[in-house]
Amino acid sequence: MKEIIYSKYSNERDAKFQIRTDILMNKYGDKFVHKIALNTNSIKHIDGIYTSYLLLTELYKDSKINVPKCTKINNGVELEYISGKTLSEELDQIFFREDYAQLVDRIREYAKVITSEGAEKFQITEEFVKVFGEVELSNTLISANVNNIDLIFDNIIINDKWNIIDYEWTFNFLIPINFIIYRAIKIYIDGSQKRNEL
């Protein structure tokens, strides 16, 4: 039997995205993550997490990125729990040592890793417009067909692989990869006043 040791409700969202995230532990101390639909409208969103797992696993199968195992459960999904140091924590250690060259190198490595798989030229699609609206972007931008826009530094745990611990916001259409990189850097800088000088 698994016992819930942490729970977070995301019920401030639109009804079709409302979920609960639980961390559970079994009697052996093994941990698991459950993402559960809070209503019938959000079941499609939960199903999308499983679909994202399949898409990302295929995309990153020959890379240094690992997509933790995901299985379907009643009204939700169960994800493999990964512990370790996040890329954010690693960047903080480098930043607090004031080794700015290494910090930039590590962020460039992140950009290279996420750019290396499935890259192609950007085109605005109907699906893109539905999510991001009408925007003018160059068709020379590098993009990918499968994109986790929440691939921020806090969502990557590094051990022998780069483990993506949250892929709830993955889309199966072209998105400029520079947007994902920009978003990750912005969230990292804005996440702590200590990082403001960046």
For every predicted segment, state its role.
Residues K130-R195:
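Catalytic activation segment of kinase domains across protein kinase-like and atypical kinase folds
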Residues F32, V77, W162-N163:
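Hydrophobic residues embedded in beta-strands of well-ordered beta-sheets
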Residues I36-A37, L79-G84, D166-W169:
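Short loop/turn segments at strand-loop or loop-helix junctions that form parts
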Residues N66-G133:
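Conserved structural core of kinase catalytic domains
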Residues L198:
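A conserved mid-domain beta-alpha-beta active-site/ligand-binding segment of alpha/beta enzyme cores
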Residues Y28, I73-N74, N159:
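Structural motif
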